[in-house]
UniProtKB/Swiss-Prot annotation:
Quinone reductase that provides resistance to thiol-specific stress caused by electrophilic quinones. Shows a preference for naphthoquinones such as plumbagin. Also exhibits azoreductase activity. Catalyzes the reductive cleavage of the azo bond in aromatic azo compounds to the corresponding amines. Preferred substrates are methyl red, amaranth and p-aminoazobenzene sulfonamide (PAABSA). Its EC number is 1.6.5.-, 1.7.1.17. It comes from the Bacteria. FMN binds at S10, S16, V17, S18, M96, Y97, N98, F99. Its cofactor is FMN. The lineage of its organism: Bacteria, Pseudomonadati, Pseudomonadota, Gammaproteobacteria, Pseudomonadales. Binds 1 FMN per subunit. This is FMN-dependent NADH:quinone oxidoreductase 3. It catalyses: 2 a quinone + NADH + H(+) = 2 a 1,4-benzosemiquinone + NAD(+); N,N-dimethyl-1,4-phenylenediamine + anthranilate + 2 NAD(+) = 2-(4-dimethylaminophenyl)diazenylbenzoate + 2 NADH + 2 H(+). It comes from Pseudomonas aeruginosa (strain ATCC 15692 / DSM 22644 / CIP 104116 / JCM 14847 / LMG 12228 / 1C / PRS 101 / PAO1). It holds the Pfam family Flavodoxin_2. The gene is azoR3.
Amino acid sequence: MSRVLVIESSARQRGSVSRLLTAEFISHWKIAHPADRFQVRDLAREPLPHLDELLLGAWTTPCDGHSAAERRALERSNRLTEELRMADVLVLAAPMYNFAIPSSLKSWFDHVLRAGLTFRYAEQGPEGLLQGKRAFVLTARGGIYAGGGLDHQEPYLRQVLGFVGIHDVTFIHAEGMNMGPEFREKGLARARERMRQALETDTSLCVPLPTLR
């Protein structure tokens, strides 16, 4: 049995393509892994504060000197960090906002990139402490950006996940979502085919998956 942590970061509850992909991913994953446990953290329903003086202070001062607000900030960060550390599989649903990730997802990373917990400073430089985990990134993009100079989303996510030791990362892009019905249909079809390929090449699958649609 594996633990699967899903992070939803779309600001929209309705009409969100990244949420659509997440729902399909979870549905088909459960068919193949019925015993796995899912935890979904929705950053739109439960927004996190941006990195601020309270959290920075809590990280850098002794516990007995924390104010009540600093304790709450640290407890939140600890809870989020432990969720990530306990997960075997991470699923990030990340629409592209202004060529990058939603600020809510950046805030989540700011809470869980913790020296001594998710990475450490070693003699040879920073070392990720979350080796052995897998990640799937489900993105929705209004235009077509993969492999181009305006795609600051995938390079950043690969770097930040690799920084904490997560190198087995699969990206599933739904592109052209705002370019008209034809582009949208083709973009969703490509994303679903990529998802099907990613799930079918999972060596732990014990049953064939139905067609993604």
